[in-house]
Amino acid sequence: MLKVLMPTIMLILTTWLTKPAWLWPTMTTNSLLVATISLTWLKWDSESGWKSLNSSMATDPLSTPLLILTCWLLPLMILASQNHMFMEPLNRQRSFISLLISLQTFLIMAFGATEIILFYIMFEATLIPTLIIITRWGNQTERLNAGTYFLFYTVMGSLPLLVALLMTQNNLGTLSMPLIQHMYQMKLHTHGDMMWWTACLLAFLVKMPLYGVHLWLPKAHVEAPIAGSMVLAAVLLKLGGYGMMRLIMMLAPMTKTLAYPFIILALWGIIMTGSICLRQTDLKSLIAYSSVGHMGLVAAGILTQTPWGFTGATVLMIAHGLTSSALFCLANTNYERTHSRTMILARGMQVILPLMTFWWLMMNLANLALPPSTNLMGELLIITMTFNWSNWTLTMTGLGMLITAIYSLHMFLTTQRGLMTNHIISIEPSHTREHLLMTMHALPMLLLILKPELIWGWSYX
């Protein structure tokens, strides 16, 4: 763990000591080196699945893909932020990069933690840099409102979790993940036990977010700068799914009946958020609601508590992390040129930026889960599992996939086709930096098609 964690922490020092002219190239290169080193975690050499295990940190097949995604995202965020941060004073640029690096440090410690309390502390710590990024570097004054929503939803959701964890510590005597999975599971009999069960999962359902407690997400996404949107969509939402999988081990056996209403709500949320997407005019808002729908499917997969459900959820989390991050980058390239997030004002882009249209098409097709993408693999596993749980869910998941395809193609056609608007007189061409950014999103997606077992989670050890 330290071979990645120490260089990441040292990047903060590098940020403040680098010459101004070399700040962005140096940070991009160094963070890319750290991301490359993190790939060594993919090599399994233990029967138990746990690797580099010590008293507080370790990696296993579930956390490794998420850890690598976290490390991979830092150079991409730095690349994407260069254009709008370049005019800021030097110290602000350095503060911004330092916040991104500190966020990555907290995320590595959250995904790598073996103690659930350490995971909880890091889960809450990620809130601070994200909140500063949204409220300080957001575009409109509405960002303060978005920051308040984000703060209160997260804190109010996770306070019951802290109480539940302290109760568990008293009952079991330990909160170590490798130990808990081999211990006697707690029986849930009384109404108090059921409340304890809900408290354990509420924080993660808010973070995912489940439909019904999702209002903070579109606000935070729309108002955040590009780096904030990328890290929110790609990694922070996945903390919810990861936490649910970790804690659900100690919540069996009665969890199956308690999970029913949540599965129904998650599946209903897919249709509802899809319908909301069909009416959106704001590009970033559309992608944000799309994330809510996809994470609803992940929640349903986890709550079925079967190997297929867990595998499908892990695969979809990684695939969605790369896809939604890429879509936010594309939305940002449009925003930097037209200074508007309204889709209809940025139409006809295919004429001016034809190569960008290729990226738009590719990412939209990945978003609607076109074969042979990893998105499809994750969705099919979860849909098969929920169908096995109840045949009626097929109508909801099938309709959800259909609506996803409709709004993805609608987004593509609205932004890329049609007549150009008169107010767009001169638009700068696409930069090599932007194509590099999109290539670095697409490359893992394409490579994972060839070896998807790397992101199968617990099914692959």
From Swiss-Prot:
It is a multi-pass membrane protein. The keyword Electron transport applies. GO terms for biological process: ATP synthesis coupled electron transport; electron transport coupled proton transport. It catalyses: a ubiquinone + NADH + 5 H(+)(in) = a ubiquinol + NAD(+) + 4 H(+)(out). It holds the Pfam family Proton_antipo_M. Signal peptide: none annotated. Its EC number is 7.1.1.2. It comes from the Eukaryota. GO terms for molecular function: NADH dehydrogenase (ubiquinone) activity; ubiquinone binding. The chain crosses the membrane at residues 20-42, 61-81, 93-113, 114-134, 147-167, 197-217, 225-245, 258-278, 285-304, 309-331, 351-371, 393-413, 436-456. The keyword Acetylation does not apply. One of its GO terms (cellular component) is mitochondrial membrane. Core subunit of the mitochondrial membrane respiratory chain NADH dehydrogenase (Complex I) that is believed to belong to the minimal assembly required for catalysis. Complex I functions in the transfer of electrons from NADH to the respiratory chain. The immediate electron acceptor for the enzyme is believed to be ubiquinone. This is NADH-ubiquinone oxidoreductase chain 4. It comes from Latimeria chalumnae (Coelacanth).
